[in-house]
Each structure stands twice: as structure tokens, then as C-alpha cells.
């Protein structure tokens, strides 16, 4: 009877989560995952993917600089990641004389490889479950703050006492909303040098227009090399360091991929929220995303109107516009995908079955109020969540005058709380920050953005959380007053204030109209919004942990219950597949270089194509990298479940060979962070044959290909 109840309870959960998708812990693949991967065509064993006793795939897939993924592709530490992951390093080495962003860069020897300050890659050494140690003593604690303090203390003890080598690091991460804790032993290499990068017209082809979009034709890759000391251990940069000898590196397949082929993606996905209740998903779909999209829509339209008329403004605002557009586009795709897949309704169906099964299993005392409590708390937090997101977009992100004011108010607080020494210590760094900000600032553009966004902000902010200055106001008069009279609108104005004594600084801050406006916004945010938001969010987090506990308690080993992404090493797998996002629209899983020429716009910053690449295409001079049909493969799709952080992840075939490089998702499937739908969710990879073609045939850097192990 007990077995029946457990299965009955999980019928509802399994219906929602029991489908392809998932981001799996590589040390825990035995059982359901192993069987499923074999069914999909995998020839490897799980020990080939993760092992502490022998070399395995994990030893060739390091975390790239804390935000991307990467893969080792030679026995000399040659490292492959995305162009957009290495963009900052490529940019840092670029000058007017040597513009590597525009023209590309290819080191002809080890001596020409370029060091990068603060760049690091981190390898996974060992993964251990430490849940019992971390949760020890917490069972009887009901106060969430006290429980969190003890957990932090226990984690610190685990990190301190877990065995490791002197050059390695220990860290502990929470899984399943705090129902499981895992120790990661890692080693970090800090001498990582730039080896090669295609020009942006290849590495960023399509830029903002093609971002999140299929069909895709972006050669999104760059090459680095890991260096180590003479003992092959991590070391700070030194000219005496030597190329790292990896425990494992990926052989590269030239065989290509076809529809239905097995694909495994190994990397470090950042954040997902797959187990949110329907109330939370509805709030994202109907409240949070529309607010964020609404503000950014205004920002982008204003900036674009100026960028189209003025080349100087276009240059200043190009990177800023791209940053704003990135998640604006993602949130729109996410919202559309949630609606199209009926995510809220599916969650509600699952919750109804969940509630019925709890009653049958006589679990009302433990779990009977979960869903009603979720509904109550999400309704209660909604105005504060809306306010917090509006404030984030309005005060801190999209308007320089307001974000500059916020920074100076933080400096003022440091002066009040920590004294003049702290004030003086922070001024220099803040001044450097302002120099960077004003380098790409235009006062009139910022004013116009403010004047239009403030109207949307005031109209959508809950009235009890709206500052008095924005009740019955004239947007044009307000903008004129702030931008004509505040020192926040120019670098010289900000510099003059930062050069004042502490006493003079405080007085000047009191009398500036811009500072006073930002102060009013921040005081409302800090005293009325966040205290309530944090209190309710703490309750929701505790409830989510209990909800996750119930899901785990009633799941079977064969159920597809994977932990949300949290920046740790994960395996996701699927198959090469196209998709149909709308009526009468069906996409193939592959693109070729032909598509680059179809999109080519001479001189365009997004769709220009280098002459040499056009020549190679015209001659069909693809070398050994073209396919049997005489085409040059470029990108392909699969059903692998990825998110931010998977950029640069290796795409691996059934035998453990590298076949591609993950770099994006399709727009229609970006809701996979919240709800994975196998019909719509696809990850986008650049075909490894195109990577090799660009390195060898386009750049003439065949010496790098010679380092690699090619499988024909």
C-alpha cells in the first residue's frame, strides 16, 4: 500500500518533469541516466565521463573565468571556448595598430601567445556528497535565520577539513533548494594565454540581430592555452611556465553530425528554476517580464533613434545597447515560450494531482498547506517583486544619471559608517569607474531615455511604493531640472565633487537636485520595498525547500528529478534535431556557409563578411572540413538542456569526441530556465569542422590543427 501511495503521488510530478531534458551531476549518472544515454546511442560508459580513478571527460572541461565553459583540445593545454567568452581578453589586447577584434589574432608560436591579467580556468578534481555533515544539528531548528547560520558554520568546517592537495580548493554548493549539499574539489590555473581568435565578422557574425535566433551562422570561438609550472601545477603568470599537460583532452571528429545523432554537452550552467510553483511562473510571465521588457523597450528605441543619426553616438552606445538588448530579447522569448507551451496550466495540473496524492498518502501534516501557502505568499509579494524589478531597471541599470547618483550615495554611506579613511580609499576607484561610464555617455541621449522611462516607471509602480516626486509630475520639466542643474551629468561635475573634502562632499550632496531625486528613490527602495520583499522571499525559500523535499521523497530512481543549475559542472544530453516553432514553420538542424553569404551586407557591423572568407566560399575551398555534399557545415541544433554558463561547453559525440561548441539557445525555447519543453527547446552549437576550417583554411594557422587529434 505504501508503495502505491508513493507512485500515485509522483504521477503528477513525473508528468511535468518526466521528459527529456535535465542538467545532471556527473558523479551520479549510474542508473536511469546511463540507460537513457545508451538508448540514445552513447557508446561510452559513465566512468568515461566522470572518474576520480582514471582520466575522464571531466578532466578536459574546465570552468572558463567563472562564467563560461571550455574544453582542452591538445596535449599541450590548447583550450577552446566561445569568442564572446574571450571577448574581453581579445579587446584588452586590441589597439588601433593591432585591432584583433576587427582583424582577428593568431599566434604563430608559443612566444607570441598573449598573457591575460586575472583570467583563470578551473578543473574539477572530485565531487562528494556532504549533506549529512552540512545539515547536522539543523533538524530541530525552526527559525530560518538560525538554521542558515548553522549551515554556514557546518559548510565552513567541511571546507576546512575535507582532504585536498595544497594547490587545490574546496567549495560546497546547495542542491535541490538546500535538500542536498555537495563538496567540489578543484584546481585553478591562472596563467592562460590568448592563442587565436577570428575577426568579429566571423566570431560575432549576426551580432544582436541574430542573438537567440535560428538559423544561425556565427563562428563563435576563440583559442587560449593553459600554462603551468615545471611540476604541471597551477601557477601565477611567469615566463618560465610551460604548456599544461592535461589528464585528458578531446579528440576531434571530422565525421560530422546528422539528425538523430547522440549529443552530450558538458559545462557549467548558471541558474535555472525548474521547480517553481505555478503561482511563481504566472508572476514571471504576467508581471515581472512585462515590466522589465517595457522599460528596456523604451531604452532601446531611444538609443537606436540617436545611433541611427550620429556615428559618434553609435560607437559610444554599441556595447551598452547590446547589453540592454540581450536580456530584453531573452525575456520576450521566455514569455512567448511559457505561453506557447502552456507552462502555467501544466504546473497547475501537476499541483492538483500532487494535492490529491498527499491526502491519499496521509501526508497533510507535512505537505498539505504547501500549495495554498505558495499562492498566498506569491500574491503578497507581487507588488514588492514588481517594485524591486522596476527599481533595478530604472535606478541601477539603464540611466547613467541615476546609477551614478546611486554610486555616490554608497560612497556617502561609507563615509558615515566607516569614516574618512574608507571614504578616501574608495574615491580613486570610483573616479576610474566614472571615467569609463562617461566615455560612453551622451547627456542628451541619457536625458531622453530618462524622460520617457520615468513615465512608464511611475505608471507601473504600485502607488504605495511610488515616491512623492513622481506623483502628479511633468516628465519634461523634471528631466530639464535634473539634467540642467545636477553635477551627475558630466565627468567634470562628478570629479569636482570627488575632489572635495569629506565635509564639503557631504554639503554638496545635500544641495544637488539629482542626488536628492536618487536619494528619494533609494530610500523608498531600501525602507519600504526590500525589507518586505526579503521577509516574504525568506518564507518562500523555506517553502520551496519543503516542496523540493516532497518531490524528492516521493520520486523513484527512474524519475527525472535533476537539481537546478547553480554554476557547477553538469552533463546534459540529447540528440541532433530541428524543430517547428510555429504553424507552417519548420527548421532544419543544420546551417552552412551558404547562409553567411545569403545574410552578407557589405560594410554592415553585424553582417559584413571578410573578403578571404568570401573567396574560399566562392571556390568551395573547404579542404577536409566540407561535407559530402560540397557544403561547409556551420552550426547545428540539439535537444540538450542548456542555459547561461554553458557558453563554450564542448558538444561531444557518442564516443567522447568533440563535434561542436555550444554558444546559444533558440529564442522560442529560452523558457527552458523555468520549463523545458522538448518540442521547442534547442541549444545552438558551432560545428567543429567550421572551427577547424577557419583556423586552417581562413587564418592559415594549420600548426594549431596539427596539435589536435583528428578522428576521420
From Swiss-Prot:
Regarding protein family, the annotation reads: Belongs to the peptidase S46 family.
What protein name does the entry list?
Asp/Glu-specific dipeptidyl-peptidase
UniProt-listed Pfam families: Peptidase_S46
Outline what the protein does: Catalyzes the removal of dipeptides from the N-terminus of oligopeptides. Shows a strict specificity for acidic residues (Asp or Glu) in the P1 position, and has probably a hydrophobic residue preference at the P2 position. Preferentially cleaves the synthetic substrate Leu-Asp-methylcoumaryl-7-amide (Leu-Asp-MCA) as compared to Leu-Glu-MCA.
Q: Which InterPro entries match?
A: Pep_S46 (IPR019500), Peptidase_S1_PA (IPR009003), Peptidase_S1_PA_chymotrypsin (IPR043504)
Q: What is its EC number?
A: 3.4.14.-
What does UniProt give as the signal peptide span?
A: 1-18
Enzyme superclass (EC) = hydrolase
Top-level taxon: Bacteria
The molecular function terms of the Gene Ontology recorded here are: dipeptidyl-peptidase activity; serine-type aminopeptidase activity
Amino acid at each position: 500500500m505504501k508503495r502505491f501511495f508513493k507512485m500515485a503521488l509522483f504521477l503528477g510530478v513525473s508528468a511535468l518533469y518526466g521528459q527529456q531534458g535535465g542538467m545532471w551531476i556527473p558523479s551520479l549518472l549510474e542508473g536511469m541516466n546511463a540507460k537513457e544515454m545508451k538508448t540514445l546511442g552513447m557508446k561510452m560508459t559513465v566512468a568515461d565521463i566522470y572518474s576520480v580513478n582514471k582520466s575522464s571527460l571531466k578532466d578536459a572541461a574546465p570552468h572558463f573565468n567563472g562564467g563560461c565553459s571550455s574544453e582542452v583540445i591538445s596535449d599541450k593545454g590548447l583550450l577552446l571556448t566561445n569568442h564572446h567568452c574571450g571577448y574581453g581578453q581579445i579587446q584588452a589586447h586590441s589597439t588601433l595598430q593591432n585591432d584583433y577584434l576587427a582583424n582577428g589574432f593568431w599566434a604563430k608560436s608559443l612566444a607570441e601567445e598573449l598573457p591575460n591579467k586575472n583570467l583563470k580556468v578551473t578543473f574539477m578534481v572530485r565531487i562528494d556528497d556532504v549533506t549529512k555533515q552540512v545539515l547536522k544539528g539543523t533538524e530541530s531548528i525552526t527559525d530560518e535565520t538560525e538554521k542558515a547560520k548553522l549551515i554556514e558554520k557546518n559548510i565552513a568546517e567541511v571546507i576546512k577539513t575535507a582532504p585536498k592537495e595544497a594547490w587545490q580548493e574546496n567549495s560546497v554548493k546547495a542542491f535541490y533548494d538546500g535538500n542536498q549539499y555537495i563538496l567540489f574539489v578543484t584546481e585553478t590555473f591562472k596563467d592562460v594565454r590568448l592563442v587565436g581568435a577570428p575577426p568579429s565578422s566571423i566570431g560575432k557574425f549576426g551580432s544582436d540581430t541574430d542573438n537567440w535566433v535560428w538559423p544561425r551562422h556565427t563562428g563563435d570561438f576563440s583559442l587560449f592555452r593553459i600554462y603551468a609550472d615545471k611540476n604541471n601545477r597551477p601557477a601565477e603568470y611567469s615566463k618560465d611556465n610551460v604548456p599544461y599537460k592535461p589528464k585528458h583532452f578531446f579528440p576531434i571528429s571530422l565525421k560530422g553530425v546528422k539528425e538523430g545523432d547522440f549529443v552530450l554537452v558538458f559545462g557549467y550552467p548558471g541558474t535555472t528554476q525548474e521547480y517553481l510553483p505555478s503561482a511563481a511562473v504566472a508572476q514571471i510571465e504576467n508581471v515581472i517580464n512585462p515590466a522589465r521588457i517595457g522599460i528596456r523597450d523604451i531604452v532601446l528605441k531611444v538609443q537606436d533613434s540617436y545611433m541611427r543619426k550620429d556615428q559618434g553616438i553609435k560607437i559610444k552606445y554599441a556595447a551598452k545597447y547590446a547589453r540592454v538588448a540581450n536580456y530584453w530579447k531573452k525575456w520576450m522569448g521566455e514569455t512567448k515560450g511559457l505561453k506557447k507551451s502552456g507552462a502555467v496550466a501544466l504546473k497547475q495540473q501537476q499541483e492538483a494531482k500532487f494535492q490529491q496524492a498527499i491526502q491519499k498518502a496521509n501526508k497533510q501534516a507535512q505537505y498539505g498547506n504547501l500549495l495554498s501557502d505558495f499562492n498566498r505568499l506569491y500574491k503578497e509579494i507581487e507588488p514588492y517583486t514588481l517594485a524591486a524589478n522596476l527599481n533595478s531597471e530604472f535606478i541601477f541599470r539603464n540611466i547613467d544619471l541615476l546609477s551614478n547618483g546611486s554610486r555616490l550615495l554608497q560612497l556617502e554611506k561609507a563615509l558615515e559608517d566607516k569614516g574618512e579613511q574608507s571614504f578616501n580609499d574608495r574615491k580613486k576607484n570610483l573616479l576610474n569607474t566614472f571615467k569609463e561610464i562617461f566615455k560612453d555617455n551622451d547627456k542628451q541621449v541619457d536625458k531622453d531615455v530618462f524622460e520617457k522611462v520615468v513615465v512608464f516607471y511611475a505608471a507601473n509602480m504600485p502607488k504605495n511604493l511610488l515616491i512623492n516626486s513622481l506623483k502628479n509630475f511633468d516628465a519634461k520639466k523634471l528631466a530639464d531640472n535634473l539634467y540642467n542643474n545636477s553635477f551627475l551629468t558630466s565627468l567634470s561635475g562628478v570629479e569636482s565633487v570627488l575632489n572635495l573634502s569629506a565635509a564639503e562632499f557631504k554639503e554638496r550632496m545635500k544641495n544637488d537636485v539629482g542626488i536628492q531625486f536618487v536619494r528619494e528613490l533609494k530610500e523608498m527602495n531600501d525602507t519600504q520595498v526590500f525589507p518586505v520583499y526579503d521577509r516574504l522571499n525568506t518564507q518562500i525559500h523555506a517553502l520551496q525547500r519543503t516542496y523540493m523535499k516532497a518531490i524528492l521523497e516521493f520520486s523513484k530512481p527512474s524519475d527525472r528529478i535533476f537539481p537546478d543549475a547553480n554554476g557547477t559542472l553538469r552533463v546534459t544530453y540529447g540528440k541532433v534535431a530541428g524543430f517547428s516553432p510555429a504553424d507552417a514553420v519548420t527548421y532544419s538542424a543544420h546551417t552552412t556557409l551558404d547562409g553567411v553569404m545569403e545574410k552578407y551586407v557589405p560594410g554592415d557591423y553585424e553582417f559584413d563578411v571578410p573578403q578571404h572568407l568570401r573567396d574560399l566560399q566562392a571556390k568551395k575551398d573547404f579542404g577536409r572540413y566540407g561535407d559530402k555534399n560540397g557544403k561547409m557545415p556551420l552550426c547545428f541544433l540539439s535537444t540538450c538542456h542548456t542555459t547561461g554558463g554553458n557558453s563554450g561547453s564542448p558538444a561531444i559525440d557518442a564516443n567522447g569526441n568533440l563535434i561542436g561548441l555550444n554558444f546559444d539557445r533558440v529564442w522560442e525555447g529560452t523558457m527552458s530556465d523555468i520549463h523545458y519543453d522538448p518540442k521547442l527547446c534547442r541549444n545552438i552549437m558551432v560545428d567543429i569542422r567550421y572551427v577547424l576550417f577557419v583556423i586552417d583554411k581562413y587564418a592559415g594557422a594549420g600548426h594549431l590543427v596539427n596539435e589536435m587529434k583528428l578522428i576521420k
